[in-house]
């Protein structure tokens, strides 16, 4: 088996990161070697990597995946990847896509493994989650903690509910700033995302997510007041009618204490009120 490429040597050959692209390249060999193992049990027939950079993780993924698609926004690094991994590309094992991961067409991947660009981590995550595929993704630690947070904790919020609507989320490793070049100002974390159907039903998914977003803008208010105060965000025409249809026990709590299932039940009530046919004209 060929030894993995040296991440520091890859940076020397590819060129220093561009600060305008918020690039922080993982250079700790031990972490790089561990990341693919967190995808054990996932279908690695076609692995998607977002933010491939100089290819240190790409190199490790090629050793465990049947095929890898690497997306890289920086054209200079995309060109370097095509040159550095020319043999893998020629063999059909690697595709390099130059472009913004929020805009390019993504392949029908079987799992995603990435050290995400932190500036677009949220947007990329919510582009990938609806695909229902397992993922191993690197985030800022604070972001990862919010993804995995439980109701009633200070970290719990819109991100927690929306992520856990699609998948089980677990932090599998915390990564220090020293593992990157250049070093970020914060710690990072590797998150394992295992898709599953929620144990509740939502009447309309887009409305559910919008409703959750709205209520968390008033997280310190009671749920009663949050529903009334955020109709301009959630799109409710008659928030008082929604409040009247919900149990007082729920209305008296704060949004931060509501489970995803309770949010779903609330959203379903609101959706039912909003879409109920009006009275027949006389």
From Swiss-Prot:
Signal peptide: none
Swiss-Prot/TrEMBL keywords: Cytoplasm, Methyltransferase, RNA-binding, rRNA processing, S-adenosyl-L-methionine, Transferase
InterPro entries: KsgA/Erm, rRNA_Ade_diMease-like_C, rRNA_Ade_Mease_Trfase_CS, rRNA_Ade_methylase_Trfase_N, rRNA_adenine_dimethylase, SAM-dependent_MTases_sf
Subcellular location as annotated: Cytoplasm
Residues reported in the UniProt entry to bind S-adenosyl-L-methionine: 24, 26, 51, 72, 100, 115
GO function terms (MF aspect): RNA binding; rRNA (adenine-N6,N6-)-dimethyltransferase activity
Pfam family membership, one: RrnaAD
Principal location: cytoplasm
Enzyme Commission code(s) on record: 2.1.1.-
GO annotations of cellular component type: cytoplasm
Family indicated by similarity: Belongs to the class I-like SAM-binding methyltransferase superfamily. rRNA adenine N(6)-methyltransferase family. RsmA subfamily.
NCBIfam families the record matches: ksgA (TIGR00755), PRK14896.1-1 (NF011486)
Function according to Swiss-Prot or TrEMBL: Specifically dimethylates two adjacent adenosines in the loop of a conserved hairpin near the 3'-end of 16S rRNA in the 30S particle. May play a critical role in biogenesis of 30S subunits.
Protein's recorded name: Probable ribosomal RNA small subunit methyltransferase A
